[in-house]
Amino acid sequence: MDLTDTQQAILALIAERIDADGVPPSQTEIARAFGFKGIRAAQYHLEALEHAGAIRRVPGQARGIRLAGQGAQTRTAPVSEVARDDVLRLPVLGRVAAGLPIGADIGSDDFVVLDRVFFSPSPDYLLKVQGDSMRDEGIFNGDLIGVHRTRDARSGQIVVARIDEEITVKLLKIGKDRIRLLPRNPDYAPIEVLPDQDFAIEGLYCGLLRPNR
């Protein structure tokens, strides 16, 4: 199926955002970028892209768009049983709060083997989510999120951040004279980082796995 110029441009935008931010654009952002009056037009073009095999969509996720060839695979088998060039063996390093910050619980409890192309950018480890403050981004309690280890992040990216000795996952907003960590659930209040707090970016959110439960 041939793609229209608009659909090719939307596909390019999706790839660009995944490469730059680690997450695809939302339907609202696609509609805004192309001047659509509502998200229905964005949905129409995404349906066409999916039908053409250019993307696949994950039901129930606000940004559940994956480029063709991306897919989740959890394995309990040893790494030697799958092609080493195509997979990552990632440690599950405890918990991260999607709610109020919780005390860090970082330790290698388990490993997950998954397709190398599942996340972007490539993750260094996984954290288990506790809480539902990021539910509108499709991140739910019990999910395993991929984290790309870095100290650098831009405003608008979803980050794993440390405040004193506590770890949380939130949307980073950097203002002229303040830093805030925003939930994606109206039941939670933003967290403002105070000047006397020890604050650091631990990594970028780059996708998730949803264990069977």
Curated annotation (Swiss-Prot):
The record marks 98-99 as: Cleavage. InterPro entries: LexA, LexA-like, LexA/Signal_pep-like_sf, LexA_DNA-bd_dom, LexA_repressor, Peptidase_S24_LexA, Peptidase_S24_S26A/B/C, WH-like_DNA-bd_sf. One of its GO terms (molecular function) is serine-type endopeptidase activity. The keyword Protease does not apply. It comes from the Bacteria. Pfam families: LexA_DNA_bind, Peptidase_S24. Keywords: Autocatalytic cleavage, DNA damage, DNA repair, DNA replication, DNA-binding, Hydrolase, Repressor, SOS response, Transcription, Transcription regulation. GO terms for biological process: DNA repair; DNA replication; negative regulation of DNA-templated transcription; proteolysis; SOS response. Belongs to the peptidase S24 family. Represses a number of genes involved in the response to DNA damage (SOS response), including recA and lexA. In the presence of single-stranded DNA, RecA interacts with LexA causing an autocatalytic cleavage which disrupts the DNA-binding part of LexA, leading to derepression of the SOS regulon and eventually DNA repair. This is LexA repressor 2. It comes from Xanthomonas axonopodis pv. citri (strain 306). The lineage of its organism: Bacteria, Pseudomonadati, Pseudomonadota, Gammaproteobacteria, Lysobacterales. The gene is lexA2.
